């Protein structure tokens, strides 16, 4: 069974293992979106402390990690393009899965659960960004109904900005 749960501090090491696995996977794909400095252990610790860190679990085991922020993203205030969505939105950052769990369709399952979480909170819009070389994430986003809206600057580099409006 796949679940999306608020991460707790006792899961920090497993969540970071998923992020570190994602970082290595990016390098295997020939690009660097995440450096050794970001996201780091303190980034995840802060996410979890603030109630924004989520663990993707398979049969209770941490298989992935992501940040879901319902407070918006200041970097999204300026876009070369235009957001299609207005009003409150959730931001998805730092989605990664442990290598052991790859190939199970977890990204699609996770987005389905993110949408359910947003619906339960009355939030109908989701925004995400990714690097230009991250073709896999672009494919996952587009397959899950996200639409390219333009380019934003996040942490000093250009990212492709996507959004999705929920029914």
Residue ranges, per PLM feature:
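Conserved acyl-donor/pantetheine-binding loop and adjacent beta-alpha core of acyl/acetyltransferases
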Residues: 67-94, 99-102
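Conserved beta-hairpin
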Residues: 52-69
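Glycine-rich phosphate/pyrophosphate-binding loop shared by adenosine-nucleotide-utilizing enzymes
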Residues: 2, 61-65, 90
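Conserved GNAT-fold acetyl-CoA-binding loop/helix
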Residues: 23-43
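Conserved catalytic-core motifs of GNAT/GCN5-like acyltransferases
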Residues: 129, 142-161
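Conserved acetyl-CoA-binding loop-helix of GNAT-fold acetyltransferases
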Residues: 97, 103-116, 139-143
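Conserved GNAT acetyl-CoA-binding A-motif
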Residues: 111, 118-130
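A short beta-loop-alpha structural element at the N-terminal edge
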Residues: 3-17
């Amino acid at each position: 069974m796949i679940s999306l749960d608020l991460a707790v501090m006792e899961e920090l090491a497993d969540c970071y293992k998923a992020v570190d696995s994602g970082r290595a996977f990016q390098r295997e794909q020939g690009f660097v979106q995440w450096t050794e400095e970001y996201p780091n252990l303190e980034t995840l610790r802060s996410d979890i402390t603030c109630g924004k860190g989520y663990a993707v679990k398979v049969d209770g085991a941490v298989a992935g990690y992501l940040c879901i922020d319902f407070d918006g993203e200041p970097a999204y205030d300026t876009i070369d393009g235009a957001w299609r969505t207005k009003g409150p939105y959730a931001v998805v950052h730092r989605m990664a899965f442990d290598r052991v769990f790859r190939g199970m369709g977890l990204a699609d399952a996770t987005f389905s659960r993110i949408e359910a979480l947003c619906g339960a909170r009355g939030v109908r819009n989701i925004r995400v960004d990714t690097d230009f070389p991250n073709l896999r994430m672009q494919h996952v986003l587009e397959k899950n109904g996200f639409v390219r809206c333009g380019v934003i600057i996040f942490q000093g580099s250009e990212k492709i900005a996507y959004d999705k409006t929920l029914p």
